[in-house]
A protein has these predicted regions:
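Surface-exposed, non-catalytic interaction/assembly patches
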Residues: 101-108, 157, 166-240, 264-281, ...
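Amphipathic, non-transmembrane alpha-helical segments in extracytoplasmic/periplasmic proteins
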Residues: 32, 37, 53, 93, ...
Length: 523
């Protein structure tokens, strides 16, 4: 290495800097920066020199530069042996962001923005958080299958935000970039450059259509102006290639218009950033990082101006310090089917919905008892002023549908008896012959095909029973027949009024009714 470089391991400089053969630091949006050190090692079976172990801290600084080229933690150590006995040691390290992809917990975040989530996840990593935009506030966010880094990248990405470590801070920024543009001039500080105008991903507007899973409300938002840090005279027109329409993402669950607006904005930002991109090789500068703005000069006027870096690779070796850079935004993920809806079991913990929307609060045992929050409950015929309302009770087991596999978007499909025996399965001779509905305190409706009866009963013993041969109305308490201002008509072959001074239970009353009907010449 022909440029003065200070490499430290656990705060101590290398014992023999002359053994350093090369340094490579690669950084791109939303990924931990990687540093690889290549050193000449002791030949044969000699001990590793330097004696570096995973977990050691590594720092790389260039002579005369205030900011570090890299600060991070060793994750891998390799030794490569040649047939002549010579050996190379390769030490691979990542910046502190790498620890987020090694952690995965089951937990719930309430009322959190992307910036606040980053602050919580980075607590203990020695990284502060600086955000150009906080992103929309999410009512409820469940971490269940993601690592910390995957969760943060997904939440930030849906808000059009990108991640990058800058010294002791984690920056969240849009594709507008940050900082004053760093000047780069072709023929002076830039050795090679390629500028590309590409309308393959062009789009004039982006729209998102979705729905609120708890309120069952349709949502829709649109973005028509991108946040782009590229400021050059060349302005490609998507209409030149027939891309002046609206690109629409559909069936997106979200709890607010802000969420969907941010998602639409993120899509448009990426499409516009890809219209004109630059990549090249420049004189090495540690200040060149993903997210930084650069000002290209010495090129034709239409493409001269400001761009935003998305990827940089620093190399320090016998040829000096060079930086390869690129401004192309991350590409779209491979085309795939949307995440499938899944179903899982839930346990109801509360039904006293603070918003009065008939929801149930549910935990998910198969997800580590994560609190999914207040979920909508499927009710037959539900609508304004109508429908069947039959909510579960606390401790009931329910079946929950998870659109896109997301617990926070769940919908309760219904309750399950599970291991609890039904109070009346209604099976007669191997057929389902009786349907029934019963509340927890014993009010019931029974439709009995086997007995050809319809019965409505209270827990106190009052009932109305309809059979082909007999209809019985029995009151366990006082009975009032009332039609104020209207006529009351009692018709029959005979009409009898009998005195019954003693109360009777429901079974006795039903038997007495059948006896009286037969004695009067009925069924």
């Amino acid at each position: 290495v022909n440029r003065a470089v200070l490499v430290t391991v656990d705060g101590r400089p290398l014992a023999d800097p002359a053994r350093l053969r090369g340094i490579r630091v690669a950084a791109r949006l939303d990924r931990p920066a990687q540093c690889e050190l290549t050193l000449a090692a002791a030949p044969g079976a000699g001990p590793l020199d330097p004696p570096v172990r995973p977990g050691a801290t590594v720092g790389v600084r260039l002579d005369g530069r205030a900011e570090a080229l890299f600060t991070g933690e060793v994750t891998a150590v390799e030794r490569e042996y040649a047939g002549d006995g010579s050996a190379l040691a390769r030490i691979r390290a990542y910046d502190p962001l790498h620890r987020l992809r090694k952690r995965q917990e089951l937990r719930v975040f309430e009322s959190v923005t992307a910036a606040e989530l980053a602050g919580e996840l980075c607590a203990g990593l020695g990284l502060g958080v600086t955000a150009e935009d906080d992103g929309p506030r999410l009512d409820r966010l469940l971490q269940h299958r993601h690592t910390d880094l995957e969760l943060l990248c997904e939440v930030a990405g849906r808000a059009g935000l990108h991640l990058g470590v800058d010294g002791d801070r984690l920056r969240l920024f849009t594709l507008d970039g940050y900082g004053d543009p760093l000047p780069l001039t072709l023929g002076e500080t830039v050795h090679a450059l390629r500028v590309t105008e590409n309308l393959d991903r062009a789009g004039a507007q982006c729209a998102v259509l979705g729905w609120h899973p708890q309120r069952a409300e349709p949502l829709g938002e649109r973005a028509g102006e991108a946040r782009s840090g590229r400021r050059i005279p060349l302005r490609p027109d998507p209409g030149d290639v027939g891309a002046d329409g609206v690109r629409t993402a559909v069936d997106q669950p979200g709890r607010s218009g802000d969420e969907l607006a941010a998602l639409a904005q993120a899509g448009l930002d990426a499409r516009v950033a890809a219209l004109v991109t630059a990549e090249g090789t420049a004189e090495g500068d540690p200040a060149l990082r993903p997210g930084r703005r650069i000002a290209l000069a010495g090129v034709p006027e239409p493409v001269a101006g400001v761009y935003v870096l998305t990827e940089v690779v620093h190399t320090v070796d016998a040829d000096g310090h060079l930086t390869r850079f690129c401004t192309a935004p991350p590409g779209p993920p491979p085309s795939a089917a949307p995440p499938a809806a899944t179903v899982t079991l839930g346990t109801v913990t509360d039904v006293d919905d603070p918003d009065g929307l008939g929801r149930a609060r549910v935990t998910l045992p198969a997800y580590g008892d994560l609190d999914a929050g207040w979920l909508a409950v499927l009710c037959p015929g539900a609508g304004r002023g109508k429908g069947i309302v039959a909510l579960p009770d606390p401790d009931d087991t329910v079946l929950v549908a998870l659109p896109g596999g997301e617990p926070a978007s769940g919908v309760v499909l219904g309750s399950l008896f599970g291991a609890a025996e039904p109070y009346d399965a209604g099976i007669v001779s191997g057929r389902s012959r009786r349907w029934s509905m019963r509340t927890g305190t014993g009010q019931s409706i029974v439709i009995d095909d086997d007995g050809r009866a319809l019965r409505l009963a209270t827990d106190a013993g009052s009932f109305v029973e309809l059979r082909p041969e007999l209809t019985t109305v029995h009151a366990a308490g006082d009975l009032v027949l009332s039609a104020p201002g209207r006529a009351v008509v009692v018709r029959g072959r005979t009409v009898d009024f009998l005195h019954a001074p003693a109360a009777e239970d429901a079974e006795t009353a039903a038997a007495q009714a059948r006896t009286l009907a037969r004695s009067a010449g009925g069924g």
